[in-house]
Regions:
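An N-terminal boundary/leader segment
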Residues: 1-60, 280, 293-295, 354, ...
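Short, surface-exposed loop/helix-turn segments at secondary-structure junctions
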Residues: 102, 106, 144-145, 242-246, ...
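Short helix-loop capping/hinge segments that flank enzyme active sites or metal/cofactor-binding pockets
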Residues: 7, 79-99, 253-268, 316-370, ...
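Structural helix-boundary/capping segments
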Residues: 17, 43, 121, 125, ...
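Acyltransferase
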Residues: 27-35, 64-67, 276-302, 325-331, ...
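Short, well-ordered beta-strand elements within core beta-sheets of diverse protein domains
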Residues: 19-25, 85, 103-107, 214-221, ...
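Short glycine/serine-rich loop/turn segments
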Residues: 79-216, 267-269, 381-405
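Conserved short alpha-helical elements in the N-terminal third of ANL/AMP-binding
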Residues: 96, 419-422
């Protein structure tokens, strides 16, 4: 019997914080963690297809270097020596970056994206590039499979990042979020996923979907791990004009302070709309009730101008995506998936006046959200992350049978997520139970700009009362 230092069945189930503690106590090594992750990739990849590229030798070399640095007393922080997945739209020097598209097939950047550079500076081990929808916008082919139900949608566009962390082949992963693409797979995979405040994490070197809506953030198994990852990747970046200058705090400093006196708002009319299924409704109401029992103040509110946001988000995203891809569409249009190409071309037909009108509507919405937080003295807003658990891949674009308005699952999935992209405020999804079919359910907290620490504090308090985050889809490993 191998001991905990080398037994991969022990190592892969450690959280980032647990693995970091073992590294510093000499109970394991970065090399052992990395070998365990690579073994898990080999065991699960044929089933779930989470990775686009696995640079195993580079990862092993980095792990040996991490061990040598730690032995010499050069401790880079809590991610030092920890295997992390990176969404394949983030540039990685000397490692192929394809963004899920034949358009970029074989492309090897000559520099790292800032988020990858920050991970490297923190001593993290890039275990692999995770699969995503084409340019974080189109299709996911060949499809990444949900480890909870192989014929169901695992969420996207940070598809592989969510699945990799779920099957324990990475301890955490980087995702991106333009309308929900971190929080959707986090909810579907029983993970913690954070979309930080706009500009909190640099998007330099990340393939653009929508300049004014894109966010880069962490996906992890626990709230504490998420706080540790955000602390490592958040910074001001002179290479990114949208990067914020706000100082980066220690996100773990007040994480255990509890929720007594914390004010959490809910607009039940909006967040519990008819598309929310009973299992999700009950799970979310349970979170609200438990937080109230812990001392939080639950405040009934009305969200502002919500009828503006769907059109605003889609218009801005379509125009900015088509602008970014205009030259590539003309030069390599035949290499795009037809669905992606058609969607991008549609964005070119949107009048400039309509785009500007939507930008102005977004600013009115942002102002109204800020006023709501100030007027009601809110620390967060709460909702389900997803109105329903994941659907079968074959049903994603079919009208839901439980609704009479023709809404498809893919439209339902962004109902609660896209407003945080428009508002630019931070939003986190965390586990809160399972459906009657055994599928994960997540709840969402949206906070004040640059107050990710409060979201971690609330989510950590709830996490301590349950073991939801510890449950995993063991059938995938059989």
């Amino acid at each position: 019997m191998l001991n905990g230092m080398t037994d991969p069945t022990v190592l892969i189930n450690l959280s980032i914080s647990e693995a970091a503690a073992m590294l510093r106590q000499g109970e394991t090594s970065s090399l052992a963690l990395t070998e365990a992750s690579l073994a898990r990739i080999q065991q699960t990849e044929a089933t779930v297809n989470a990775y686009a590229t696995v640079p195993a030798e580079l990862a092993l070399e980095a792990a040996r270097q991490a061990d040598a640095e730690l032995a010499a007393g050069n401790d880079r922080g809590p991610l030092h020596g920890i295997p992390i997945g990176v969404k394949d739209i983030c540039y990685t020097k000397d490692v192929v970056t394809e963004a899920g598209s034949k358009v970029m097939e074989g492309f090897v950047p000559d520099y790292d994206s800032t988020v990858v550079r920050k991970l490297n500076e923190a001593g993290a081990i890039m275990i692999g590039k995770t699969r995503c929808h084409e340019f974080a916008y189109g299709v996911n082919e060949p499809p990444t499979r949900s480890p909870w139900e192989l014929n169901s949608y695992p969420g996207g566009s940070s598809t592989g990042s969510g699945v990799a962390v779920t099957v324990r082949s990475a301890y955490g992963a980087i995702g991106t979020d333009t309308g929900g693409s971190i929080r959707i797979p986090a909810s579907f995979n029983n993970l913690v996923g954070l979309k930080p405040t706009y500009g909190r994490v640099s998007a330099y070197g990340v393939v653009t979907l929508s300049w004014t809506l894109d966010h880069v953030g962490p996906m992890t198994r626990t709230v504490l791990d998420n706080a540790l990852m955000l602390g490592a990747i958040a910074s001001h970046d002179v290479n990114d004009a949208t990067s914020a200058r706000e100082p980066v705090p220690d996100y773990t400093a007040g994480i255990r302070d509890g929720v007594k006196g914390v004010r959490i708002g809910i607009d039940r009319e909006y967040v519990m709309y008819p598309g929310v299924v009973d299992d999700v409704r009950a799970a979310t109401e349970s979170v609200i009730s438990e937080l109230a029992d812990m001392g939080a103040e639950i405040v009934e509110v009305s969200l502002p101008e919500f009828e503006l946001t769907p059109e605003t988000l889609f218009t801005v995203m379509m125009v900015e995506a088509s602008t970014y891809h205009r030259q590539m569409l003309r030069e390599k249009g035949d290499l795009y998936d037809p669905t992606t190409r058609a969607t991008l071309q549609l964005g070119e037909l949107v009048p400039g006046t309509h785009y500007v009108t939507c930008l102005r509507a977004r600013e009115r919405y942002r102002s109204a959200i800020r006023d709501l937080y100030q007027r009601e003295q809110l620390d967060a807003l709460i909702s389900p992350t997803m109105p329903l658990p994941t659907a079968l891949l074959s049903d994603l674009h079919q009208p839901r049978k439980d609704m009479d308005i023709g809404e498809t699952p893919m439209i339902s999935y962004i109902h609660h997520t896209f407003s945080a992209n428009l508002g630019g405020q931070p939003a986190i999804s965390a586990p809160c139970g399972f459906s009657s079919a055994g599928l994960p359910i997540g709840y969402q907290l949206m906070g004040r700009p640059f107050d990710e620490a409060m979201l971690f504090r609330i989510a950590w308090a709830y996490e301590q009362a349950h073991d939801w985050h510890q449950r995993q889809p063991t059938h995938v490993y059989d």
